[in-house]
């Protein structure tokens, strides 16, 4: 993009993420892309963060991009006991939502647009509508999950009884213009109508039609049918444009040369090509001791080499247990000849791009699945909570991976070690999946390349925001 026209011709875009690395990571990658497209960028932050990883991530980002303006949003005092939730990330979302009416001073001088996290949109929209400021949503899961989120308020309204309760008679939820979603795949928290998550889920779902557009970290080859249905207004009438801007690329600031990364890469260098299964359940989830034991036994029984990232606590500030305490001495001893187990932060992009890695066992977090798609690594998804079954379905439909519906949610402990081992063996030996994953890798490369679908979408957005400069 040319620099002609002077600095004032460049759009000025602000971004407000919420809590959790799964939300923060795509926001910072999007912000970096906006900088590279010569936008002025403001990042609205809240402190303290829930996890130490979030604080470090923001700090590294701001050091790498000094041209980005940080504006700190000071939240009102918040009593966690006033909300029907215990999850620390849900509680932080609610704390930001309750302070959203105070955002206006941070949204000046005039901006071209604000990009708001999906968890905050219903609370932030009244502010931006009052300021006549275009407000876009960054949806941090799959387009398939967005189809449920956007249509869910109407579905709930149609299922409500005279007493105010919601009754689902069927085993599936019908999504207009798309295949139905099994009721068993819907995030359990959404089904508890009294929970904080369910309330905000409905409020945010109702707000999409009032926004100016929805950005999703996906691309045409990964979710073509869903994206076509959404933009054809078949899912929800009056829905604004849905912009597939993925895969959002990792940035240099995310790559840290620390001893654990060097150890991992050296170990991978010594393994045959495509022989290692990488196992990671993301930044938020700590498996139960029982799950950890079954997964460890499954990895051993698979006979495959493996790199396993183990997490002990939900919030990293509390995670002080040693690997031996988490896994137990006996399992640690069995593992050491077949795999490498680490508890530190892992540069997932470097791992997935390594020639030795031939498969990925994942919880189904969308950022991880898109990274697997970008590197052409087939995935075995073991969903644990939230949107992850729906993400797993999207990955399976695209041909990138597999998931075992009978395992249910990971916390239900339906999967035993022997069965896990067999599925890992299937994953690593599946030539068809490997070919499909490589095809998707090539499509991902094309999408963000010159003239690719995501690159064109990005330019379309920036042109819209340039026009907004003339009206502010």
From Swiss-Prot:
Query: What is its EC class?
Result: transferase
Q: Name one Pfam family in it.
A: UDPGT
Q: In which tissues is it expressed?
A: Expressed in leaves and flowers, and at lower levels in immature fruits.
Q: How does activity depend on temperature?
A: Optimum temperature is 50 degrees Celsius.
Provide the catalytic activity annotation. a 3'-hydro-2'-hydroxy-beta-oxodihydrochalcone + UDP-alpha-D-glucose = a 3'-(beta-D-glucopyranosyl)-2'-hydroxy-beta-oxodihydrochalcone + UDP + H(+)
Superkingdom of origin organism: Eukaryota
Question: What keywords would UniProt list here?
Answer: Glycosyltransferase, Transferase
- Region (UDP) residue spans: 283-284
Any one GO MF term held by the record is: UDP-glucosyltransferase activity
Q: What's the Enzyme Commission number for this chain?
A: 2.4.1.360
What does the entry list as the binding residues for UDP-alpha-D-glucose?
140, 346, 348, 363, 366-368, 371, 387-388
Q: Which residues are listed as membrane-spanning?
A: none
Q: What protein family is recorded? A: Belongs to the UDP-glycosyltransferase family.
Name the record gives this protein: UDP-glycosyltransferase 708G1
Q: Which organism is it from?
A: Citrus japonica (Kumquat)
């Amino acid at each position: 993009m040319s620099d002609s026209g002077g600095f004032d011709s460049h759009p000025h875009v602000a971004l407000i993420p919420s809590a959790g690395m799964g939300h923060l990571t795509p926001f910072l990658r999007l912000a970096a892309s906006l900088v590279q497209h010569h936008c002025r960028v403001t990042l609205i932050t809240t402190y303290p963060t829930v996890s130490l990883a979030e604080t470090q991530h923001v700090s590294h980002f701001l050091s790498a991009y000094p041209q980005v303006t940080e504006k700190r949003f000071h939240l009102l005092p918040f009593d966690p006991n006033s909300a029907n939730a215990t999850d620390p990330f849900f509680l932080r979302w609610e704390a930001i939502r309750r302070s959203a009416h105070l955002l206006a001073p941070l949204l000046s001088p005039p901006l071209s647009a604000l990009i708001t996290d999906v968890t905050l949109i219903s609370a932030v929209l009244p502010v931006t509508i009052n300021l006549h400021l275009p407000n876009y949503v960054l949806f941090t899961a799959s387009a398939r999950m967005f189809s449920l989120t956007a249509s869910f308020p109407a579905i709930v309204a149609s299922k409500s009884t005279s007493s105010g309760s919601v009754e689902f008679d069927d085993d599936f939820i019908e999504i207009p213009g798309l295949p139905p979603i099994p009721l068993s795949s819907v995030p359990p928290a959404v089904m508890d109508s009294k929970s904080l998550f369910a309330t905000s889920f409905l409020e945010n779902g109702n707000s999409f039609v009032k926004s100016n557009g929805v950005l999703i970290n996906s691309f045409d080859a990964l979710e073509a049918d869903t994206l076509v249905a959404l933009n054809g207004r078949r899912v929800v009438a009056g829905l604004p444009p849905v912009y597939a801007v993925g895969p959002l690329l990792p940035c240099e600031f995310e790559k840290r040369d620390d001893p654990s990364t060097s150890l991992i890469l050296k170990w991978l260098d010594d393994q045959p090509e495509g022989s290692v299964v990488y196992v990671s359940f993301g930044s938020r989830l700590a498996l139960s001791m029982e799950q950890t034991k079954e997964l460890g036994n499954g990895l051993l029984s698979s006979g495959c080499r493996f790199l396993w990232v183990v997490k002990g606590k939900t919030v990293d500030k509390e995670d002080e247990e040693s690997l031996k305490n988490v896994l137990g001495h006996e399992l640690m001893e069995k593992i050491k000849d077949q795999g490498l187990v680490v508890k530190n932060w892992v540069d997932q992009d470097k791992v997935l791009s390594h020639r030795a890695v031939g498969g990925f066992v994942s919880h189904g977090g969308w950022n991880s699945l898109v990274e697997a798609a970008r590197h052409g690594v087939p995935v075995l998804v073991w969903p644990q909570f939230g949107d992850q079954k729906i993400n797993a379905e999207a990955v399976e439909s695209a041909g990138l991976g597999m998931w075992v519906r009978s395992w249910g949610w990971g916390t239900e402990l339906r999967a035993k070690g022997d069965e896990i081992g067999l599925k890992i063996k299937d994953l690593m030996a599946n030539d068809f999946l490997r070919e499909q994953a490589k095809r998707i890798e090539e499509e991902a490369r094309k999408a963000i390349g010159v003239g690719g679908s995501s690159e064109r979408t990005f330019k379309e957005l920036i042109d819209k925001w340039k026009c907004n400069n003339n009206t502010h």
